[in-house]
Amino acid sequence: MSGTMPLPPHRPGGYNVVIITLDQHAAGPAARALPRLQHDFPDIHVSVHAAAEWSENPAKLAAAKAAVLGANIVVANLLFIDEHLQAILPEMTAVRDNLDAFVGMVADPQIVRLTKMGDLDMTKPASGPMALLKKLRGKSEPGAGSAEKQMSMLRTIPKMLKFIPGKAQDLRAWFLCMQYWLGGSEDNIESMVRYLVGRYADNRDWRGIKAAAPIDYPEVGLYHPDMPGRITTDPAKLPQPANPVATIGILMLRSYILAKDTAHYDAVIRELQAHGVAVLPAFAGGLDGRPAIEEFLHGKIDTLLSLSGFSLVGGPAYNDSDAAVETLKALDVPYVTAQPLEFQTLGQWRASGGGLGPVETTMLIALPEIDGATNPTVFAGRHDPAGCLTCARGCKPDPEAESHAMAPCPERIETLVDKVVRMAKLRRSKVAERKVGIVLYGFPPNAGAAGTAAYLSVFESLFNVMHAMKASGYQMGELPESVQELRDAVLCGPNTTHGQPAQIAARIPAAEFVARTKWLKDIEAAWGSTPGKHQTDGRDVFVLGRQFGNVFVGLQPVFGYEGDPMRLLFEKGFAPTHAFAAFYRWLREDFAADTLLHFGMHGALEFMPGKQAGMCESCWPDRLIGNLPNVYLYAANNPSEATLAKRRSNAVIVSHLTPPLAQSGLYKGLAEIKESLGRLRALPPDSPEREDLEALVREQAKGVNMDASDLSTLWEKLLETEGALITEGLHVVGRPMTAEARAEMLALMPENADRARADKLLQEEHEIAGLLHALDGRYVPPVPGGDLVRSPEILPTGRNIHAFDPFRMPTAFAIKDGAAQAARLLATHPTLPRSIALVLWGSDNIKSDGGPIGQALALMGARPRFDNYGRLAGAELIPLSELGRPRIDVVMTLSGIFRDLLPLQTKLLAEAAYLCASAENEPLAQNFIRANVLATMQDTGMDFETASLRVFSNAEGAYGSNVNTLVGSAGFGDEDELADAYEARKSFAYGRDGKSTKQVNLLQNVLSKVDLAYQNLESVELGVTTVDHYFDTLGGIARATKRAQGGKETPVYIGDQTRGAGTVRTLQDQIALETRARSLNPKFYEGLLKHGAEGVRQIEAQVTNTLGWSATTGQVEPWVYQRLSETFVLDDEMRERLASLNSAASSRMAQRLLEASDRNYWQPDPATLAALQAAADELEDRMEGVAAE
């Protein structure tokens, strides 16, 4: 960077002191101090430039660059983010030697090293001042107490140096500048400038002008806008309401208070007190909130609200979550963080589809979540000159406020305060008076899915939780005495009329709905006039569920578009149906819940349209949940979707275990083949029995549809099936694992796992305790999400799941492992592919610390670049000589959740692809990305930047391709309609700036060049036939690729990293393995059927998901449908059993098998087809109540 930036021919008129920092909090003090400075230093100019503004406002970056190039003195601090450093370092480096002084402090080492103040030159580490500095500093590492020690050192060292003559005085000046800056009041900012100019300006007449010593302010204190003096250390001096209903602790940044830039804090404090709560608004010097908590808040508050925007201990450079959690556990109150916008204006945020940007999301939301923070809410920012015009309130800058001052967002502050006060009141409420709304799900509709959730036996778990709640003091009346009675009470009975899947608990007349619904226009624009078409008799809107005293168990309405193919082709989502909106308003206002409990994974609320992070009042999840506290019971192995629920539905997560795992084992004909093969393998080569035994094996293999042409391969496939891990049934909250299941789980854990700890915790019940703790309005400690077998540290469950620190992803291990995965994939395919379609989910990346990201980078021949703090900063290319093969063109399709939770990684992948495409000096035969980009430009006329885009996902605020919904509802005709849906939903290309543009033509172009499609298995608990997300994403892109290539079949591979070194299989082999190890395995399906209706629904899902693979890839062998039909529909005893447990799911299963035949995915013989049709008719009649019992 050095020496290449041209200097301006002359500096602008006057003497220019330029301050480059992270935000604008010093702008006000500098502007107010300027007239007094100009009195002593005529023609002096002081400008403050905030790096946080540069990404969204290039003009601000240009102004900062010009200011640096025209500066006499530069002060640079709080610059830690690589994007900011790369933007400004060239100019700083170019002018540094010509400045009167360069002061780099509290910043990245690259900035600090530029410091030049008289004889102090930090580029010369051996110089006298630098040697002295090293001695004075000693060893220092970030962590608990480090900030307090550093501040003490900062005050002490200038006193020590004052009496050391010569060069030490410049070192003293550097420490004094830090004191001035960190005590950043108007007086101190003025004195800092006065001191620097008076000491270092080349104008000799100014050298004698003195500056006041730094003013010391309290390191911790209390602040209130309506208190004389505004700052105190005496809580008794704070104005408080009479008889407060609760007490809220507030954490603020001292820097804003000293700078008198407090309009945003003032608004929150006043709004809270308008609700009748007492406030303890505390601040601490530095970025460690613990001293303020210990001094003023411990044992005195009902909720803690942080307005700092950072994690509790740390800031833009690091966070110490262990120290934070220790403090918050002792405090034991809800911990809420609110976000002040620094990287965009309020108007920009409000107008954006995504909400917060990548760095904002990571720094302001993801890092505090690791501390256990919840309910992220934007509450303030700075205004554009025109104000925030896209909000109905039309807020404009305060004409009396300084141009760079923080401004409150009144609408968001009202929402924030409502939520915080509700939490505090919940904590103070009496259990016997507390009202709880428990939310169950019923997706997909008409499938016997009411009251089901992934991995969870809902009604067994609910039965245990409700009885525990009653024992804890909740008023619930007489509870059902059995699980079946509870299920019947909610889903059956005299009020299940009008074809509804559950009891009708309330009827809302259409006129009442119209009068009480704030966003009626939006709902009716999507779904027609009230009362709509869902959960209604044409007059009333129904709320489904059953009330048990102060606890209501309700069934969340479905999205509503499941059976409408045209709606499924829209690129974004829709407003909720009348019934969905009515459900949540009824819970809030009519039932008057004090808190909600969403029961299991997962509902539709958090997937409603709106911003990804940092929602506003136009976002549907925010509109629906309102100010209600929300406890969310969630599977411990899904941190990605749990995090989405946190950010978009006020959720405090309480984790639960997934079902126990076991080895599949062998059954029926499979066991017989293994026995015969075992005998054969034991025979000597010349044994006369070999020929007959080989014939027997081949006959046995034919009977179970296995290929016996290579007996060694057959043996390997049998062992693979036998050793495959399967889930045993569903998890029941409140029921610890059996000793047998526990032993099998422990045996599967890594050798280095603490099995004794895991064994102890698995015998204990933590989940109901965690739920009751959360419902009491207390702090739920955080825990990383993950699979129990691979990550035993998820124990104990009953805690608040969070994702991995995005700044650290991918880790060094993930990069190495990803490269190994990439090598396995390339070795599996017969030829070296030029282009690969790769599906990336948030969940498997979060649980593997970025393994699939590492795989994508390795295929392209790139790697992540990290800054001096170990934080992700971008991408760089691996030289071809080191890579040893050509760069593969990777078309990356991200899940909507990946896009939301890993925005930095989205930018990383986009930058990596761009760098590959830009490698002009590489031969095209060694760089398939560049070759394809140039070909695309030639064929289509696209510009280089567009043609280089390789990262695709949904539009902002949208999720999924809807291929799964089309399949699930049998809502497609020709399979190309699935490609239509995929392209409509997944054609948004994300660039190096993290922003998206719709690029259907580009997606079609890059897919036309794809040689294979690939995805990793997400979890040991899941298979590609277990959930519909796999064929929605991988199947969807395979179908779109087939169409883009004129009907040519695309090889599809699955990477199974769940055990050992990993395996790559063809999709056909993967489906066959899962069908044998899971779907047809009595050990698997009997484990499910122990849970009744919910088990039948899961078996049906396996069948539907198999159909989804046929529809999208055609890679399901016909025998799969034959065996499924024989096992679950054509067997009279089994058919009767399934129908008695769940008539809707069993009927749907038979219909799916017939649909597979109708669509020519298999061709059953006439007798089988006739028997299947008869069985389906019988099941349908039974479901409709026609057949005689």
Swiss-Prot record:
It catalyses: protoporphyrin IX + Mg(2+) + ATP + H2O = Mg-protoporphyrin IX + ADP + phosphate + 3 H(+). One of its GO terms (biological process) is photosynthesis. The keyword Ligase applies. Signal peptide: none annotated. GO terms for molecular function: ATP binding; magnesium chelatase activity. Pfam families: CobN-Mg_chel, DUF3479. Involved in bacteriochlorophyll pigment biosynthesis; introduces a magnesium ion into protoporphyrin IX to yield Mg-protoroporphyrin IX. This is Magnesium-chelatase subunit H. The gene is bchH.
